[in-house]
């Protein structure tokens, strides 16, 4: 039930164009962080806001930022076009996401407000051309912004009025401390600033001293995750590693988990092991690999959000592992791209309409659990989190329970009522599938994905034109078969379905595939060997003898 005293968007004094964009996004009322932060920001106050993942923090700073920029252009003196707002985020994916949200909110004032994202690893010359047009809002990671400031592609000292630091609790742990301190030297002495964070830690306090001036602190009295009426959280104890694979197979193949799902594991190798295991049973899934280029990772997320596939396997090891301070940050060509913090995607990325989060591997820290679970039950949508636990992981599970239960002490991770003995008939199938997914198969699968990226890389297109033999070597290499797929494993005989589920699940029913493109149909009809149909010679009627 809506609080009658809560403040709606229409009562915040927002520009009618922003209100129209908010309506188009389907937001009937502001979230708690938006309701509290937007009026204070419009009063010109600095903000230090903490709110849980998925609570609408991006819009909480984007709406007042756009309102202040529009108001200045409408009522202030005519001045030269310049960069007025800077948004700092820890990763390239978050920069792309922030830019997208700001552009959606500015849809009806796109002529007045221009937004540029300079976080992508593009040529500096092309980004320089964008910055020379002096967009109103610039979004990027601290390292990329500092690089453009040092090259004089971007000048903020005389024009910037607003600074936003999103996911502030991650910036220092990602090794951006030195970049931030250097970047602040290029900013004016007076500006309004917003710090948005999911947690308050020592890094956030240090940022507060560097960036904010007499801020208002919003520490909302809300749980870090939605309540049980919106988010259901379960844990299931698996006696062995084999039991985890068996249970996951049953949940997905028998459609006990429906809708779009995120599967979290702790290492990239485990991601591919799980994907190859699921492929044995014709269960499609893709791996969100931090080693792949930004464009490829964003394309995976985009297709997942559009419903092209229902299952993504991800890891937060790159993002939520041990903190990496700036002075120890790796430099040079030997730096591992997979551990590059700007390549991480587990925290803060907006996966749309995720119905379930499956922690196939127990999160390494309680905070990691919070951020994984925050990918579902966003806004007012329901969600479920299911965590697989081995007997040796009970102590770590207890730490997660302690963080979730808080002062009440009431259990939050409820036991998932599942009788493993009912799916024992599937064990031999899972055992065979696990046996076929060897380390060599995993290595070949990763190699195959990298080769495909090379073939589709825009940057390498010119190289392959000059060196066609290298392209032929890639294309004519032996076909990779990461695991021996047995077609019959894609079907589930009725006698193997647990008695309690017979008639309720339809394991034979496959997801409807999109119709073949017109181009493919045309190619088939133009191929005489594929389109020719021999019907035999028809007997001609003969004239009756006279």
UniProtKB/Swiss-Prot annotation:
One of its GO terms (cellular component) is nucleolus. Its EC number is 3.6.4.13. A motif (Q motif) lies at residues 7-35. Residues 505-524 have a biased composition (Basic residues). Residues 230-424 form the Helicase C-terminal domain. GO terms for molecular function: ATP binding; ATP hydrolysis activity; RNA binding; RNA helicase activity. One of its GO terms (biological process) is rRNA processing. It comes from the Eukaryota. Keywords: ATP-binding, Helicase, Hydrolase, Nucleotide-binding, Nucleus, Phosphoprotein, Ribosome biogenesis, RNA-binding, rRNA processing. The keyword ATP-binding applies. A motif (DEAD box) lies at residues 166-169. Its main location: nucleus. Residues 38-218 form the Helicase ATP-binding domain. The modification Phosphoserine is found at residues 126, 531. SUPFAM superfamilies: P-loop containing nucleoside triphosphate hydrolases (SSF52540). Pfam families: DEAD, Helicase_C. InterPro entries: DEAD/DEAH_box_helicase_dom (IPR011545), DEAD_box_RNA_helicase (IPR050079), Helicase_ATP-bd (IPR014001), Helicase_C-like (IPR001650), P-loop_NTPase (IPR027417), RNA_helicase_DEAD_Q_motif (IPR014014). PROSITE patterns: HELICASE_ATP_BIND_1, HELICASE_CTER, Q_MOTIF. Residues 323-342, 504-546 are annotated as: Disordered. ATP binds at residues 51-58. May form homooligomeric complexes. Interacts with IRF3. Interacts with OCT4 and POU5F1. Nucleolar RNA helicase that plays a role in various biological processes including innate immunity, ribosome biogenesis or nucleolus organization. Plays an essential role in maintaining nucleolar integrity in planarian stem cells. Maintains embryonic stem cells proliferation by conventional regulation of ribosome assembly and interaction with OCT4 and POU5F1 complex. Regulates antiviral innate immunity by inhibiting the virus-triggered signaling nuclear translocation of IRF3. Mechanistically, acts by disrupting the interaction between IRF3 and importin IPO5. Belongs to the DEAD box helicase family. DDX56/DBP9 subfamily. This is Probable ATP-dependent RNA helicase DDX56.
